[in-house]
Amino acid sequence: MLPAIEKVFRGLIKRQSLSLNDFAGIAVGFAAIIDSRTGRVLSTNGKYDDAKGMELAAWSRETFDLGLRIENDARMALLGESYGGAARGFSDVVMMTLGTGIGGVAMIEGKLLRGKHSQAGCLGGHLPVLFTGRPCTCGAIGCAEAEASGWALPGIVKDWPGASNSTLSKYANVGFKELFEQAAYGDAIATAIRDRCIAVWAADAVGLVHAYDPELIVIGGGVMESADVILPAIESHVQKHSWTPWGKVRVRAAELGNNAALLGAVPLLAEIF
């Protein structure tokens, strides 16, 4: 893996007519539990398992003579939204990313929550919302991700009563795009599954509010192409069911899309320079 990364990076530098002297450092967003202090990948949950245990910071210094920071990709996205997106100007924020999986990360008093073992505030998608629910890839039961994520959706549709009579049955591997489209066309099964997914996300959001006391929830990910349906429902549920005597938690859509984690590289690298 590392030789391939080096080849790609050097190729990018060459195409942009740059040199290593033009870089302050390297920032990497990775879908895993990360020890950002040492630059080690701690746990990957079946994704890129060969990265586990790699000393990327030491490799970067040896290969490029550049400092490297690696961080959980959802945390990187929150840093980006805080630096120049929907969370700019807020110090206490939770961000949910809804897509293939569910990310849930937290910033408290302007700093990412990491914790003693580097996994605080980055496993929001693995809060249990139904203890008798579906098995999750993490080993738990009824996690929000197991109940309403992209990887879980085909199984949810398959097990849904009457799904064979739904237009969803024509898709070999149904995704949220197809689900929301068919719900908009009036398919009753698609509508029921869509509404249940939104309810799961809303319940997860309330759990994150109670855990981290944010003033703002930012919601991003590919599913937010349907923000006009998702955002009002989650906001209504959060404001109705969150125990926040100080006032109401704001709920906003992410603004930066796939560029959020890229922009998050700026404040992440600023932590070491």
Model-predicted segments: where are they?
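Glycine-rich phosphate-binding loop of actin/hexokinase-like ATP-binding domains
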Residues: 88-147
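General beta-strand structural signal in soluble alpha/beta enzymes
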Residues: 68-72
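Active-site-adjacent loop/helix segments that line or gate small-molecule/cofactor pockets in enzymes
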Residues: 74-78
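ATP-binding/phosphotransfer module of carbohydrate and carboxylate kinases, centering on a glycine-rich
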Residues: 1-27, 34-40, 58-66, 80-90, ...
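A charged helix-plus-loop insertion that forms the helical arch/lid used to bind
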Residues: 39-53
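Active-site glycine-centered loops adjacent to acidic/histidine catalytic or metal-binding residues
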Residues: 73, 99, 265
